[in-house]
């Protein structure tokens, strides 16, 4: 029974693939050498035994096919079973990224609250400046009169500042800062866990790829063993002079094994492709936790600087309110009012500086955090 042209062509391709694999894999090359030697020895043995009539086709089948080929096929099957999982989907990483974006959004919300408080502080700053300007006008007046108080208009402006109060005094920012710190600590722990998990996933996938590569070698071993079995069987038939029906049965054995070998290789190649795709995906997402860490560092730095400056601004406004109270309380004493207003004139300069510092810091770290968010998004989408 001859092979069809199509089968012959495919068989030749597989033989070429087997030979190429032997050239690339030392272990497979060593196996092939042993197979070649074993084939040679078996041919010699069968030739001698044929002359004495002590060999049978059944023994050839048992020696070459049943025992050796089944054992090798079992090893291949074990590896295929080990590697037959679906492509990895990292729900943990997706959750981590979502938490990171939520965290940075909360930070930006806090900065927005700070900005709103600063706007209120600027309004208070204008009241103080107006009071200082009015104080200078009032100081220039002469002969105020008994019914008119010299610094009446000045005190009216100060009352506006007092009515406004301290925009940083409601405790909202303090609560937000404390919650933000806890959230960042929790997120940092999750980032660390995810980095370790991804590293472990990569290590496991690499091991499985190594196993599949080994299985690929084994599949070539199977093919080599099949070819060996076919050659040995045909030689045995010729040596024993068994009739045509049995010879024909042996001839049809190789195409079946070749087809089985093709099936094994098809599964192995699919498994290897899936694992390589999984490894590629893991390596792609591996930098993401590190990028999130970078973003958190920017977050942390901002959350460290802003509260400090906010506290300083809050203290400055509290000090101004106390001085305003003193000035209002000294309503009947022009000398005391004058001293308090001169102090406020110096303090409002410090207030202006503090407001500017907070505004610049919030703007700077808001920009940094937004850029960090963008970099993470670019890494996730593969555009960065």
From Swiss-Prot:
One GO location term (cellular component): membrane
Coiled coil: 184-215, 264-361
TM region(s), chain numbering: 217-237, 242-262
Subcellular location: Membrane
Protein keywords: Coiled coil, Membrane, Transmembrane, Transmembrane helix
Membrane topology: Multi-pass membrane protein
Pfam families: DUF677
Keyword Heme: no
Family label: Belongs to the UPF0496 family.
Name of the protein this chain belongs to: UPF0496 protein At3g28310/At3g28320
Organism the protein comes from: Arabidopsis thaliana
């Amino acid at each position: 029974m001859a092979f069809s042209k199509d089968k012959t062509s495919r068989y030749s391709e597989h033989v070429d693939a087997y030979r190429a694999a032997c050239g690339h894999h030392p272990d497979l090359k060593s196996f092939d050498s042993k197979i070649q030697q074993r084939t040679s020895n078996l041919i010699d043995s069968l030739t001698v035994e044929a002359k004495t009539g002590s060999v049978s086709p059944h023994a050839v089948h048992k020696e070459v096919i049943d025992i050796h080929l089944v054992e090798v096929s079992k090893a291949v099957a074990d590896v295929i079973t080990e590697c037959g999982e679906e492509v990895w989907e990292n729900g943990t990483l997706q959750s981590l990224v979502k938490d990171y974006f939520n965290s940075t959004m909360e930070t930006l919300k806090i900065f927005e609250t700070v900005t709103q408080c600063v706007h209120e502080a600027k309004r208070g700053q204008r009241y103080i400046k107006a009071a200082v300007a009015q104080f200078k006008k009032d100081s220039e007046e002469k002969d105020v009169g008994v019914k008119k108080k010299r610094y009446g208009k000045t005190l009216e402006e100060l009352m506006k500042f007092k009515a406004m109060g301290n925009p940083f005094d409601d405790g909202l920012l303090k609560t937000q800062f404390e919650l933000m710190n806890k959230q960042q600590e929790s997120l940092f722990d999750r980032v660390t866990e995810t980095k370790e998990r991804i590293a472990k996933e990569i290590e496991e996938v690499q091991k499985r790829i190594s196993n599949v590569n080994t299985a690929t070698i084994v599949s070539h071993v199977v093919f080599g063993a099949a070819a060996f079995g076919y050659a040995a069987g045909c030689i045995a038939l010729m040596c024993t002079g068994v009739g045509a029906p049995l010879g024909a049965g042996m001839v049809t054995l190789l195409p079946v094994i070749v087809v089985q070998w093709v099936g094994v290789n098809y599964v192995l190649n699919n498994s290897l492709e899936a694992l390589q795709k999984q490894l590629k995906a893991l390596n792609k997402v591996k930098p993401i936790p590190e990028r999130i860490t970078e973003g958190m560092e920017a977050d942390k730095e901002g959350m460290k600087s802003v509260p400090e400056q906010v506290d300083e601004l809050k203290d400055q406004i509290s000090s101004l309110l106390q001085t305003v109270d003193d000035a209002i309380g000294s309503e009947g004493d022009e000398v005391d009012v004058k001293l308090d207003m001169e102090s406020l004139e110096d303090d409002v300069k410090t207030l202006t500086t503090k407001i500017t510092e907070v505004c610049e810091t919030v703007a700077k770290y808001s920009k940094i955090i937004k850029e960090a968010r963008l970099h993470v998004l670019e890494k996730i989408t593969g555009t960065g």
